[in-house]
A protein has these predicted regions:
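Short alpha-helical scaffold segments that flank and stabilize functional sites
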Residues: 7-10, 34
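Mobile, glycine-rich extracellular loop/lid and propeptide segments
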Residues: 1, 8, 15
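Inter-helical turn/loop segments and adjacent helix faces that build the functional surface
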Residues: 11-28, 73
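Extended ligand-binding clefts on enzyme/binding-domain cores
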Residues: 2, 25, 32-130
Length: 130
């Protein structure tokens, strides 16, 4: 869901850059509405669920990195990134953070994308394990 929401916001930005302000506003409002739905549907205490209807699940939200890469300020609030970064710290194993609650393996590319959630101090501490 997050990837699609970011894609809508990116499309809104493209419309804005091409001078189509009213169309841009429509898609930005749609994306923000989906963010609000996601925040409520995926909330699971100290983290966000892997799937809306599965409480107790978790996953790396690596596709939210594109909000930061594309500089889409104000879409998903910073609290989402902060909350997820704390959760990932509790899930970290010697080889990294598993992709989700179903498996113990990870992928370096997706974990790298998730690293965008962390503050600089955490990244420096993590560096000694790489």
């Amino acid at each position: 869901a997050g990837k699609g929401i970011v894609a809508l916001a990116a499309y809104a930005e493209l419309l804005k850059l091409s001078g189509q302000e009213s169309e841009s506003a429509k898609y930005q409002k749609l994306a923000q509405g989906f963010v609000n739905d996601w925040l409520h549907g995926a909330a699971d205490g100290d983290h966000f669920r892997r799937q809306y209807d599965l409480p107790g699940t978790w996953s790396q939200k690596y596709n939210l990195v594109w909000q930061k890469v594309l500089d889409l300020h104000g879409l998903f609030p910073d609290s989402v990134f902060e909350k997820e970064a704390v959760e990932y710290g509790t899930r970290r194993q010697s080889y990294g953070i598993p992709l989700d609650d179903r498996h113990n393996y990870t992928k370096a590319d997706w974990s790298t994308w998730s690293a965008a959630f962390y503050k600089q101090a955490y990244l420096m501490a993590l560096r000694k394990h790489v």
